[in-house]
From Swiss-Prot:
The modification 2,3-didehydrotyrosine is found at Y69. Pigment protein that is green in color. It comes from Anemonia manjano. SUPFAM superfamilies: GFP-like (SSF54511). This is GFP-like fluorescent chromoprotein amFP486. There is a cross-link at K68-G70 (5-imidazolinone (Lys-Gly)). Keywords: Chromophore, Luminescence, Photoprotein. Changing A165 to M/I: Shifts fluorescence to higher wavelength. Belongs to the GFP family. Contains a chromophore consisting of modified amino acid residues. The chromophore is formed by autocatalytic backbone condensation between Xaa-N and Gly-(N+2), and oxidation of Tyr-(N+1) to didehydrotyrosine. Maturation of the chromophore requires nothing other than molecular oxygen. The precise stereochemistry of the tyrosine has not been determined.
Amino acid sequence: MALSNKFIGDDMKMTYHMDGCVNGHYFTVKGEGNGKPYEGTQTSTFKVTMANGGPLAFSFDILSTVFKYGNRCFTAYPTSMPDYFKQAFPDGMSYERTFTYEDGGVATASWEISLKGNCFEHKSTFHGVNFPADGPVMAKKTTGWDPSFEKMTVCDGILKGDVTAFLMLQGGGNYRCQFHTSYKTKKPVTMPPNHVVEHRIARTDLDKGGNSVQLTEHAVAHITSVVPF
């Protein structure tokens, strides 16, 4: 378990607000949740409102990796490693992430996380383009993310993350996406060594249209156990 930050308790709340557009479909997402930062677990519920009304026009899974994998304070870090993310508070931090999908779909997201009392406030924007009309995203054929690893690398005074992730598909098969993320703190912090974060998201649909969703995440950081020659 990471060393504690007096501003971050064992149990914390979260609120979310996202504005975005995917293939010309504008939407807003609001959510709330709670979790245990030092254990690397969290659960949240989200409600999507389409600008033109009606059910969600694409798979919610492409948004879930902004909300989950989207506040790295909820990652279990060992006491031997500086926790870049928890050190950032109460000042806050920003994230920038690009998503490149195997069928040409591309998305970008940016968000700010601030701390108000025992609650993280997560405010984001999301833009996605070039998703094929008959592809897994627009046809809503994805069933959630396979567990994956994020490689964390210190670069130019910030932490950068790289993930090759796979969405699972109805009927079997996978759909590949590459994430690239820049994590920026608003104050200087002690940098960790290069390391990996092992993480898993689980999605539960709360309505048939996909507009209401529950997400849970478990994330653990560690240094590779492979011994150098």
